[in-house]
């Protein structure tokens, strides 16, 4: 399924001209890892460990947001929130995945420009709270109610 992805990172303005996501960053790719140190020994008696939340990363073309993203990273600026929105491309343009983060810090900006291609950068975000919402598609093509994963990383609690 083709998707458009947009990032609203604090008050940093990107180059999106989209009506619903004007001045946001147009995202090329997204990644985020959550792991758990659970251990299941032979004979049973295993237990869950503590979840480890890696930085969420996006890749986008170098654009007018780049200097401000670099500045926020270099200064350790705290951003109130950031939102990554995935939208089905084409007619209807339904937003099916929304990742909202609170108390955000940009922990890395890695720029690259292989060969004669235009440059891109990977921006890494660390955050204190996340609300990850997915809206499944129904048989008629509309979206169902959102299913949430909400987690307070600082207190290590769901919700």
Model-predicted segments: where are they?
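Glycine-rich, low-complexity intrinsically disordered segments
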Residues: 1-159
């Amino acid at each position: 399924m083709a998707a458009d992805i947009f990032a609203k990172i604090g008050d940093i303005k990107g180059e999106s001209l989209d009506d619903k996501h004007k001045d946001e960053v147009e995202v090329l790719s997204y990644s985020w890892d959550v792991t758990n140190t659970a251990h299941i020994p032979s004979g049973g008696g295993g237990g869950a460990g503590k979840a480890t939340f890696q930085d969420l990363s996006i890749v986008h073309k170098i654009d007018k947001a780049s200097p401000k993203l670099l500045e926020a990273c270099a200064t350790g600026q705290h951003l109130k929130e950031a939102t990554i929105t995935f939208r089905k491309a084409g007619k209807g343009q339904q937003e099916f995945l929304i990742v909202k983060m609170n108390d955000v810090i940009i922990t890395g900006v890695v720029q690259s420009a292989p060969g004669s291609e235009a440059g891109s950068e990977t921006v890494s975000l660390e955050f204190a709270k996340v609300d990850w919402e997915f809206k499944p598609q129904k048989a008629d093509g509309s979206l169902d109610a959102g299913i949430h994963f909400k987690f307070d990383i600082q207190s290590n609690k769901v919700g």
